[in-house]
Amino acid sequence: IYEPIENIHQDQILKYSKIPADITSNIYKNAQDTAKLISEKLDYVGTMCVEFFIDQKEDLLVNEIAPRVHNSGHLTINAFNISQFENHVRAVCEFKIEEVKKIANAEMNNILGKEIENYRKRTFSSEEHFFDYGKKIIKDKRKMGHLTKLKK
């Protein structure tokens, strides 16, 4: 189980994700326990994202269950020893599941629409990992890539 990832949305589109999430240890534990319970009750195999809202009483409300790898988890490619993508393939192919270990705290920014043009021209530091999805048609608010910044 990966640690909770904090997401910020803009116009109903994921704009930014980060670890560690700015949550209490109680919310952290409840989020992991609830996600695990959902997975067990569904007898689910593979990567699943459970998205929560936190109310003013610090209760968790399940907003979405995504039975797949999820955009918010793209930072697992660089911030963990094993990504959500590899773990998903391992699970569905019944390969050994590796223990998840965090390498670094991280932030991931989705690159939307024409923003991609500036990113394609940039030079990145060794802590920055740029992913260009190679989409030929640029549309406003379309996810064109992402940038993960490791916080070592």
Per-segment meaning from a language model:
Residues K139-T148:
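Short helix/strand-capping connector loops at secondary-structure junctions
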Residues M108-N109, L147-L150:
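Hydrophobic structural segments
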Residues N78-F85, A91-V92:
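C-terminal structural cap/anchor segments
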Residues K102-L112:
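Short glycine-/aliphatic-rich beta-strand segments at the starts of folded cytosolic domains
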Residues T123-F124, K149:
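Expand to "…catalyze enediolate/carbanion chemistry for C-C bond making/breaking, isomerization
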Residues I116-K121, K152:
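Short, conserved charged micro-motifs
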Residues I1-I23, K29-V62, A66-H74, V89-E99, ...:
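Phosphate-binding core of ATP-grasp and ATP-grasp-like enzymes
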Residues D55-E58, L112, K151-K152:
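Short acidic-glycine loop/turn motifs at beta-strand connectors
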